Curated annotation (Swiss-Prot):
Keyword Magnesium set for record: no
Residues at the catalytic site: 268 (nucleophile), 351, 353
E.C. code: 6.3.5.5
Protein's name according to its UniProt entry: Carbamoyl phosphate synthase small chain
PROSITE patterns attached to this UniProt entry: GATASE_TYPE_1 (PS51273)
Annotated organism of origin: Helicobacter pylori (strain ATCC 700392 / 26695)
Length: 375
């Protein structure tokens, strides 16, 4: 059994199918119908519980190759868990996977009702426990739990040292990931790792960019020096967890990179940090965008792209003073992409690599390659 307590006073008890223990975090909902392993292992969900709108989970099991990272969300909530999986690439059940990664699994709850609660109240803090089942004690645990905006989440998911990414994209012929081939690499880029998804790095390398992964706290002077010596051709600012406004030290370094006119691409958290670094602070959405079915309009082509998204924060409208808005979300008209006027920088809020989700925005990586050619 697992007991849940939400900050709005809601107390629930349900079945456990994951790890044992007690976890507190922010509760968000995800509307993806597949790809739960990639969602669970996305570093951007660090410190969060994910409730899936898809009522069934577990039918394809899990494997040792599709993880986005070594890190995981705090817990998973689903209407029904299926222990009997069927997939040629599966190595173990989802339950075994969650237990190995220390992730709580909750099933047998009315997820539709929970999602309506989040839609009405916004994201809520929650504590879940397979050990403590007293409502008052759970309330006390939650009261003392740090808010996600005050937690040093990025430092817990970033690489501790400079590394080279060794994998490229998935090969549907072999049903495995291609090894990175140095011969296909045309340029080297620095990846500022705030919690980068593996498939973003795969896609960068698939378009001919060798990815050198740097810690989140890397000094701008080090990257500027590498750029001036032509050791790197540009910089990618990755996705990651938490409130972007909490990363003040990193924002200060990014300001220097912008002033150095280094070509850059930002995705998700990276997109937000580029905005903040230029004096345009982000704001928090009521319940965020999480899922692989969000329509986004490309304002240049007028095409509507179905995108994968995972964020709770958004850049402000007045960023139009220094940037051309390139994409908008058709659910709420929030900004999804910009091209800066004052520097060779493009950034998007959604995830062009998807994983899970459609590949309709994959061209963003090729646009970055074209941007690098001009410098």
């Amino acid at each position: 059994m697992v007991s849940l307590y939400l900050e709005n006073g809601l107390f629930l008890q349900a079945q456990s199918f994951g790890a044992s223990g007690t976890q507190a975090g922010e509760l968000v909902f995800n509307t993806s119908m597949s790809g739960y392993q990639e969602v669970i292992s996305d570093p951007s969900y660090k410190g969060q519980f994910v409730v899936f709108s898809m009522p069934e989970i577990g039918v394809v099991g899990a494997n040792s190759k599709d993880d986005e990272s070594f890190f995981s969300c705090a817990g998973v909530l689903a209407r029904h868990y299926n222990e009997f999986f069927s997939n040629s690439r599966a190595d173990f059940s989802l339950s075994a996977y969650l237990k190995e990664r220390g992730v709580l699994g909750v099933c047998g709850v009315d997820t539709r009702s929970l999602i309506k609660t989040l839609r009405h109240h916004g994201c809520l803090m929650m504590v879940a426990s397979t050990i403590e089942h007293d409502k008052n004690k759970l309330e006390e645990i939650l009261k003392n739990a740090p808010k996600i905006s005050h937690s040093p989440l990025v430092s817990s998911v970033s690489t501790p040292k400079i590394t080279t990414h060794q994998r490229a994209t998935f090969d549907f012929k072999t049903l495995d990931y291609k090894p990175f081939d140095e011969k296909t690499s045309h340029k080297i880029i620095a990846v500022l790792d705030f919690g980068a998804k593996g498939n973003i790095l795969n896609e960068l390398q698939n378009v001919g960019l060798k990815a050198l992964i740097y810690p989140h706290h890397t000094k701008a002077s080090e990257l500027i020096k590498a750029y001036e010596k032509k050791e790197i051709s540009g910089i990618f600012l990755s996705n990651g967890p938490g409130d972007p406004l909490s990363l003040q030290q990193e924002i200060g370094e990014i300001k220097q990179l912008i002033n150095a006119k280094i070509p850059m691409l930002g995705i998700c958290l990276g997109h937000q940090l580029l905005s903040i670094a230029q004096g345009y602070p982000t704001y928090k959405l009521k319940f965020g965008h999480h899922g692989s079915n969000h329509p986004v309009k490309n304002l240049k082509t007028n095409a509507v792209e179905i995108t994968a998204q995972n964020h709770n924060y958004c850049v402000p409208e007045d960023i139009e003073e220094i940037a051309i808005i390139t994409h908008r979300n058709l659910f709420d008209n929030t900004i999804e992409g910009v091209r800066y006027k004052n520097a060779p920088i493009i950034s998007v809020q959604h995830h062009p690599e998807s994983s899970p989700g459609p590949k309709e925005s994959h061209y963003i990586f090729k646009e970055f390659v074209e941007l690098l050619k001009d410098f």
